Amino acid sequence: MKQAILTQIRRLGGNTDGVTGESLQADLAAIVFKNPLYPAGYVAELIGVAEFWEQHQPLYQTDRPAFYQRLLAHFFADQELPYGQAFFRNFLFTPFKEDSPDYGELAGLVTPDEIRQVVAGADLDFMCICYSYGFPDHYFVCLTDADQENPTVYGTDHEVFFSELTKEGTLEAFFNGFITPEEFLAAATKHLENGKAA
């Protein structure tokens, strides 16, 4: 996996200590996030920030550094309150590999040939890497992608699981599409200092 991807994962709060470069599958499986991921577009809405401010006004008025520390801890906790964030969850999905736990899961929904119209890869073995509250709500890579350093990310939605697929770009572009905790805090601070809490 490209070093730039690993660097961005760490900037986003992920742990890459277990990444060895052995294989794409092993590297993706070794990545750990204990926090959600916020897409870059989140800063335009900052869903939940005003409500958090309303609930913590006394702290905001008396100790802004503590308020912002608590704000960051709240929004980057491993929780699933619907703020428009995404969640890194790395699990193997092998619906066409005989004797795998997923074998046959897509039977009657989509064929390997239909998937190959969008997905490039010798074997259709996938690592699901993320889900979100948006559309699509599941993201994955094909483990036999020709570019093992920076594979293509695909998207699908639970309502049309794998019968409708979209190319979302490279893995590097995918992770670059999220904001860091520092970027989140800067946007929230600007919003509160210049707007609602002024």
Features from the language model and the residues they span:
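Long, low-complexity, intrinsically disordered segments enriched in glycines and aromatic residues
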Residues: 78-197
